[in-house]
Amino acid sequence: MASVNKVILVGNLGRDPEVRYSPDGAAICNVSIATTSQWKDKASGERREETEWHRVVMYNRLAEIAGEYLKKGRSVYIEGRLKTRKWQDKDTGADRYSTEIVADQMQMLGGRDSGGDSGGGYGGGYDDAPRQQRAPAQRPAAAPQRPAPQAAPAANLADMDDDIPF
């Protein structure tokens, strides 16, 4: 059976993006995104809130775009996959693990006052296969034009209702 590793987040950036470049020149961008859940506590009746922080990494062109346009506080939509990586602590030499979201789609949300143009959607980084372009759709032949039916003139304007229907 096939498996699914898909993450979708809508949240706010907790800090400005950090962009760096690998030795081969590929851009790498790290951001922290906060998502907030709200609920009403059944026992006390008071409103509760919990914020979860997510580490997100973007690569290549998507990383460059994020570094240029995203700012702390900006609302953003992210699609990607979970990835756990293993690394060694420099001080102790112990194996450490980090789970992060590798983003392959990013959509900036909000208006211009939140740091950039609204509605800018970007994807990239992992689809190395060339995309096939579809041939332009053929328009069906236009139906022959018929003259528009003529409306009969109102017999008497006084017979019309003065009430506006909306």
Curated annotation (Swiss-Prot):
Motif (Important for interaction with partner proteins): 161-166
Disordered: annotated segments: 108-166
Record's compositionally biased regions (Low complexity): 132-155
Top-level taxon of origin: Bacteria
Compositional bias of kind Gly residues: 112-126
This protein's UniProt keywords: DNA damage, DNA recombination, DNA repair, DNA replication, DNA-binding
GO MF, one example: single-stranded DNA binding
Domain SSB, first and last residues per copy: 4-110
Stretches that traverse the bilayer: none
Keyword check for Acetylation: no
Biological process terms in GO annotation: DNA recombination; DNA repair; DNA replication
Pfam families xref list: SSB
Annotated GO CC locations: nucleoid
Record's subunit section: Homotetramer.
Record's function text: Plays an important role in DNA replication, recombination and repair. Binds to ssDNA and to an array of partner proteins to recruit them to their sites of action during DNA metabolism.
Protein name: Single-stranded DNA-binding protein
